[in-house]
Structure formats: C-alpha cells, structure tokens
Amino acid sequence: VKSTNLMAFVATKMLERQEDLDTCTEMQVEKMKTSTKARLKTESSFAPRTWEDAIKDEILRRSVDTSSLDKWPELKQELENVSDALKADSLWLPMKSLSLYSKVSNQEPSSIPIGEMKHQILTRLKLICSRLEKLDLNLSKAVLGIQNSEDLILIIYNRDICKTTILMIKSLCNSLI
C-alpha cells in the first residue's frame, strides 16, 4: 500500500510540473494521467485513518476471552499450595505479589480504575509473562537433551501449561488496556 501511495504521489507531482517535462508527448502525459487516476482510485479505500476514527468505529477493540478469569480462584489456590522449591523460583515472587490484588479480580478487568493500581497490575503481569516465555524457551531447549520418555512427556505438558498461562495473561493485559 505504501509503495503504491508513493508511486501515485510521484506521478501526481510529475503531472503538476508538466511544463518541465520536455520529453513527454501528449500521449505519454495522458497515459500518466490515466494511470495516476486509477492508482488514486484504488488507494482511496486504503486511506490512512486517525486513531480517533479507528476507536470510534471500534476497529481496535478485540473480543477478549474472559473465561480464563473464572479460573483465578483455582490458580490462586495452586499458588498458595506450591512447594518450597517453587517458591525459590524467580516466578514465585511476582505471582505472589499479584495475589494482593485478588479483591480486584472479581471485577470486570475494564472496570478497574485507570491509574497507579492498573499500571502496577500491568507491570507485574508483563513481568510474569516475560518470565514464563523465558521458562518456555528453556523447556524447549531442554527437550533436545532428554532421552527418557517420561521426562519428555512431563516437559511437553509443562510447556503446554506455560503457553496456556501466557495466553491467559496476555488476554488479561489486553482487557486491562
């Protein structure tokens, strides 16, 4: 789209300076006019829009699957029942600190007031998400060195859980924005 816009712009500028085009014949100028009009006609449907127009037309709104939010009490219970080995993991602290906001988790995400609290929640969720993505990457590297089928099944299962949790966190972040 951008290259076509650029070509149409250049052709239009050339037509505006028709007196400078000594080598063009009448026929070439007419051809250029016709092709420029055709390009501009096709480009009009791709005209750039402002953010305000896009928001007004609800193009930027995405439907978010909030069914994952119903699992929050179960997830919180799992977090409280983890072993000491997991508590030493780098993921544990931000997830535990997120439980401070459990009183907000019963609300619709978009109804959380804008401000410092929402910013803190988003920051913690993004931190958790980045650490989960790093964990998923490490698990994918670990798969290559596994020779035991039970360990392989366990790693694949944990990668699926990581990916599902990452998707849940990303959808929650999108609904908070």
UniProtKB/Swiss-Prot annotation:
Listed GO CC annotations: host cell nucleus; virion component
Cross-referenced Pfam families: Flu_C_NS2 (PF03555)
Membrane found in the keyword field: no
Keyword list, A-Z: Host nucleus, Host-virus interaction, Transport, Virion
Stretches assigned to coiled coil: none
The keyword Transport is assigned to this record: yes
Residue ranges annotated as motif Nuclear export signal: 91-100, 117-127
Subcellular location: Virion; Host nucleus
Job of this protein: Mediates the nuclear export of encapsidated genomic RNAs (ribonucleoproteins, RNPs). Acts as an adapter between viral RNPs complexes and the nuclear export machinery of the cell. Possesses no intrinsic RNA-binding activity, but includes a C-terminal M1-binding domain. This domain is believed to allow recognition of RNPs to which the M1 protein is bound.
Complex and partners: Binds M1 protein. May interact with human nucleoporins and exportin XPO1/CRM1.
Record-given protein name: Nuclear export protein
Origin species: Influenza C virus (strain C/Mississippi/1980)
Gene: NS
